[in-house]
């Protein structure tokens, strides 16, 4: 079936719909990864977004049900230049189209993803809607204006506290939309993990007497998370705190810093980051649309983006606080920076 992507600036791309055949609206972004599309589909940080893959052929190795970052896809829509018709891999369990159809995600195939990416790069991230050939186009503008991703964290976070037993350090994880491979990295280091929902209370976290508090990744604008920031403030100085992505941004706000929105975000598996402590450059996996713009004097920048110079890591000069903007757990992407989890554990009591 024919379908169209209509951007809020009026630009239209025509292609073919696949997967679940129902229109979708969201924030249109692009990811530069050559592989890792199933991790992208299931990464909670992509909630509310229509993701464009810049690599021209997607679906080559199908879908396996082991490498998912959450139980089901979190994207609103999925745009590719060409979907692979005949995936081939010994781990393949489903074709991409079948997986999207089963999980009610609309795909768009056959558009010029290079041209779309250039529009997003030059004009910035914007809202968009994928409509089917038989859709009513009269209310498209109203649907775009009505779309909001403000409550995304409440949707992707766990609903209740749960524990994964281990013999090592006790880690309290605040789930703002955590990827499963982050949890796996703590578990394989022997940690006794307790995961709290996004609307946690500091008293509940401190009650389990954790050796380390971890703030997870997640979708949306960190400035919408005022209640979480207030609770984090109650933990600062009482327990070591580390974080990734949204957790990194929330820590910055907690300590008096400022966050802003990037023009088109960092999304992909090939983002170079310089470690200022070790004077080394790592290729990292990233997925964020906001960044830490300013920091108070008691914070030290530890990592910076080699592409645009934005803050990619920070630590407190006196308190046991450390966080990074990139994703050291990869999935997808290189594991150059997986050592960050060992750095996290050095902060544990």
Swiss-Prot record:
Location of the active site: 245 (nucleophile), 327, 329
Positions that bind L-glutamine: 45, 218, 220, 246, 249, 287, 289-290
Alphabetical list of Pfam families matching this protein: CPSase_sm_chain (PF00988), GATase (PF00117)
Class in the EC hierarchy, top level: ligase
Pathway(s) where this gene product acts: Amino-acid biosynthesis; L-arginine biosynthesis; carbamoyl phosphate from bicarbonate: step 1/1; Pyrimidine metabolism; UMP biosynthesis via de novo pathway; (S)-dihydroorotate from bicarbonate: step 1/3
MF (Gene Ontology): ATP binding; carbamoyl-phosphate synthase (glutamine-hydrolyzing) activity; glutaminase activity
PROSITE patterns per UniProt: GATASE_TYPE_1
Swiss-Prot/TrEMBL keywords: Amino-acid biosynthesis, Arginine biosynthesis, ATP-binding, Glutamine amidotransferase, Ligase, Nucleotide-binding, Pyrimidine biosynthesis
UniProt catalytic activity: hydrogencarbonate + L-glutamine + 2 ATP + H2O = carbamoyl phosphate + L-glutamate + 2 ADP + phosphate + 2 H(+)
Gene Ontology biological-process entries: 'de novo' pyrimidine nucleobase biosynthetic process; 'de novo' UMP biosynthetic process; glutamine metabolic process; L-arginine biosynthetic process
Stretch list, region CPSase: 1-170
Residue stretches making up the Glutamine amidotransferase type-1 domain: 170-349
SMART domains: CPSase_sm_chain (SM01097)
Enzyme Commission number(s) of this protein: 6.3.5.5
Top-level lineage group: Bacteria
Family annotation (InterPro entries): Anth_synth/Amidotransfase (IPR050472), CarbamoylP_synth_ssu (IPR006274), CarbamoylP_synth_ssu_N (IPR002474), CarbP_synth_ssu_N_sf (IPR036480), Class_I_gatase-like (IPR029062), CPSase_GATase1 (IPR035686), GATASE (IPR017926)
Cytoplasm recorded as keyword: no
Function: Small subunit of the glutamine-dependent carbamoyl phosphate synthetase (CPSase). CPSase catalyzes the formation of carbamoyl phosphate from the ammonia moiety of glutamine, carbonate, and phosphate donated by ATP, constituting the first step of 2 biosynthetic pathways, one leading to arginine and/or urea and the other to pyrimidine nucleotides. The small subunit (glutamine amidotransferase) binds and cleaves glutamine to supply the large subunit with the substrate ammonia.
PANTHER family with a match to the protein in the record: CARBAMOYL-PHOSPHATE SYNTHASE SMALL CHAIN, MULTIFUNCTIONAL TRYPTOPHAN BIOSYNTHESIS PROTEIN-RELATED
Subunit structure, as described in the record: Composed of two chains; the small (or glutamine) chain promotes the hydrolysis of glutamine to ammonia, which is used by the large (or ammonia) chain to synthesize carbamoyl phosphate. Tetramer of heterodimers (alpha,beta)4.
Family, per entry: Belongs to the CarA family.
Name of the molecule in the record: Carbamoyl phosphate synthase small chain
Gene responsible for this protein: carA
